[in-house]
Amino acid sequence: MAVYAVGDLQGCLEPLQCLLEHVRFDPVQDRLWLVGDLVNRGPQSLQTLRYLYSIRESLVCVLGNHDLHLLAVARKNELLKKGDTLREILEAPDRDELLRWVRQQKLMHYDAERNIAMVHAGIAPQWSVKKALKQAAEVEHALQDDQLYGAFLDGMYGNEPAKWNNDLQGVTRLRVITNYFTRMRFCTSDGKLDLKSKEGVGTAIPGYAPWFSHQNRKTRDVKIIFGHWAALEGRCDEPGVFALDSGCVWGGAMTLLNVDTLERHQCNCDAVGNAATGIIASAQPGNAHIQQIPAQEPKQ
């Protein structure tokens, strides 16, 4: 059995299928991990969600900010933003079935056997794996509980509080947990968030740094797979931390990582997130040489 992790899809189905065909993914035997942002901005959000639902027994997904935005928009259509490509999902006859499935997904996955965690954006540096799983479970419970669901989504948006405090309660508590897992890039060593800066690692404001670079980070003994940060272009120099968002929806590439061998594969994308007619690049871990392989035609 092979386990593959793939970066942000954002409704880009063609490059995902291209990569899965390239590695000969078998949904009966293999497993596919997804770092979240399954939908939005790309050209095939509905088709992507339907495809993932069809292979759901082979999937491990964590939710990203765009997935949570989909759930919020499904409650209140006026929340649609310029550039959203969610309308087709909202008008689909199977929308309720698809949205119920999205609600059941995690904010954090931890494979104890491999000692690997997967999140969309990151893990607060002051949290251990045990603490992070506990906080993620609070949001997961709110998503799955009909009595808490609406209040959570209504209060989810916002940048405050910027820092975790164990005494936080209610929606305010859930908001900061959500921001760590789905929106974080830069923070201070004690976890104060800067949610406005979105460029590369060298653009941090004084006192802030990429969440994974803090020396006191309590998850340094764990491998972490994450997405969200397209400006990193799928590169992270921090040992044991694997960035998989390589900007597919912006004309970059979609990245697939073999979780056990750490071999990477990339499918080039065009400006709207379709698989480009170019190549798939494959590279062994620690090997700067990239082999160029013609991309296969994605399945329809």
From Swiss-Prot:
GO terms for molecular function: bis(5'-nucleosyl)-tetraphosphatase (symmetrical) activity. Pfam families: Metallophos (PF00149). Its EC number is 3.6.1.41. This is Bis(5'-nucleosyl)-tetraphosphatase, symmetrical. CDD domains: MPP_ApaH. The gene is apaH. It is an enzyme of class 3 (hydrolase). Keywords: Hydrolase. The keyword Transport does not apply. The keyword Nucleus does not apply. It comes from Pseudomonas syringae pv. tomato (strain ATCC BAA-871 / DC3000). Hydrolyzes diadenosine 5',5'''-P1,P4-tetraphosphate to yield ADP.
